[in-house]
């Protein structure tokens, strides 16, 4: 199988242990930070006046990620038009080498137009909330200019 016995990399094992300890001790704090930012993001999107649909039941989604479709905006055009100031995605990492409709969104029963306008926005626990909102405001302005 190509696996041979050898010396365990002690530094890597210790690093993994510390990462696990931090993940456990900071979990609740990180979840609260994610949710606070998600509420602010959803509020801004709602007040923006763009026509959108959230993809997926938010009760079962990660608190640091939103997948939404902006009606009348091609996700590829939005992604390319906003790459100077923010990073959004319109597909999954496992299909990044070629553009094809998201198999997850397809399996969820979304139609082709909704899938082609879907973007994923995510943030970390330490993402600055004001910076996130400012960049999202810019993204919304670009989206409004791309509506067809």
Name what the model sees in each region.
Residues 1-148:
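Pyridoxal 5′-phosphate
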